[in-house]
Amino acid sequence: MSILALVEDRPTPREVYNWRVYLLAAVASFTSCMIGYDSAFIGTTLSLQSFQNEFNWESLNTDLISANIVSLYQAGAFFGALFAYPIGHFWGRRWGLMFSALIFFLGAGMMLGANGDRGLGLIYGGRVLAGIGVGAGSNICPIYISEMAPPAIRGRLVGVYELGWQIGGVVGFWINYGVDETLAPSHKQWIIPFAVQLIPAGLLIIGALLIRESPRWLFLRGNREKGIETLAWIRNLPADHIYMVEEINMIEQSLEQQRVKIGLGFWKPFKAAWTNKRILYRLFLGSMLFLWQNGSGINAINYYSPRVFKSIGVSGGNTSLLTTGIFGVVKAVITFVWLLYLIDHFGRRNLLLVGAAGGSVCLWIVGGYIKIAKPENNPEGTQLDSGGIAAIFFFYLWTAFYTPSWNGTPWVINSEMFDPTVRSLAQACAAASNWLWNFLISRFTPQMFTSMGYGVYFFFASLMILSIVFVFFLIPETKGVPLESMETLFDKKPVWHAHSQLIRELRENEEAFRADMGASGKGGVTKEYVEEA
């Protein structure tokens, strides 16, 4: 099998790869547009002279204030990810998305009331509420997409979540360049970027009213008829089609196995997480993936991009904003390639390994240049020398390695590697761990740059090297594996051969199942499907 082949667990009718699955993923991914925009715009907005003048920036401890404004958002997101578990369990994925959008909308609206007379209090409070909203969304959105996605393109569809993140990021990075170029320094100049947060939240509120509920959640809650009806609509197939019969059978078998082993109640997954070593082990793996993701330095760059580029030698407000905007565009373009091709063809594991290796080399080079040339000491307006241009090149090359690997892939893996009855709790833990590591990195990044200088780049480069060892020995490939077979996948050893072993077994079982169906007369297997098998 080619390393770039699209992996199907069984012959899949073309109707399954239809516009409906992409539409549902796109609507749900307005969640990530909120996250991407918020993470991108805040650092550059804080660097606008109009914002600093209105809040008398020079009289404040700017490192502390910047860190607080950024990190309160992550603190809210940590708790939002946990609060989303009962919402997703009892009310469903669709209403969970609605909840996240409403809370974010409220927080974004609160920030618009801030000004020099009122101080930063409304921004602090709004950041916490917005964080709760995006934390809840970061839990529910990947689950929703993975539960309705066909296995062969599940990575691509969950990747739409990441694409939304990058689209929001591009707008967030460029909007401050736009207002800085076109508007005089004023309250209006810096409040516009805050107001734009309302747009993706409003679109998600409208979209959540129109999309279908997750069929797997409907099965989990005992609403079998509605689950079959919804699944048939999403797959664009009649309920008695052989592909549908197989999928319904797999869902119900998985739920029955989990009912026997764990139970289906609200508290059962908590008990399973602490008593079932397999689940606890995968929770550990999911949390560690987000440690390594944040350990790459991405959020230090996202939230404090003007300072990052200044450390390389990029000076001048507009120049820094422009360089930051280009960084956002590079990420978005590469994410599009990752989404359309790499995640489901090259695979999750291979992307993580290659991205960590290449990204680490780039950060060592950038840090080495800063250590030798000390560009942060250059006078304002100094042109980049050849070394500085090379450092910028390797920074963008780091972006090219990081974006299609560690940026979205941990979200894909966490959304798919747990059984249905613990998936909501597991994703809550995974999302919360992401925001915890995100908080720790973003809270102390300003102090790290002040005290460590070039050492910050060496620190992140070293963590990327360690992530290679972690992935190689502990993370199996998951592309094309049905959600109901993930426990079997993680049981197989060695890890680097687990995927090929499982796919071979699944195809053998599928052939036997279809042969039995044909012999019993319960389902027709067309010649086309037999030949594909």
Curated annotation (Swiss-Prot):
CDD domains: MFS_HXT. InterPro entries: MFS_dom, MFS_sugar_transport-like, MFS_Sugar_Transporters, MFS_trans_sf, Sugar/inositol_transpt, Sugar_transporter_CS. Ubiquitinated. Deubiquitinated by creB, probably to control its activity or amount. Residues 43-67, 116-127, 178-191, 304-324, 371-385, 453-454 are extracellular. It is a multi-pass membrane protein. It comes from the Eukaryota. It is found in: Cell membrane. Keywords: Cell membrane, Membrane, Quinate metabolism, Transmembrane, Transmembrane helix, Transport, Ubl conjugation. Pfam families: Sugar_tr. GO terms for molecular function: carbohydrate:proton symporter activity. Residues 1-21, 89-94, 149-156, 213-282, 347-349, 407-431, 476-533 are cytoplasmic. The keyword Ubl conjugation applies. Its main location: membrane. Belongs to the major facilitator superfamily. Sugar transporter (TC 2.A.1.1) family. Interacts with creB. This is Quinate permease. It comes from Emericella nidulans (strain FGSC A4 / ATCC 38163 / CBS 112.46 / NRRL 194 / M139).
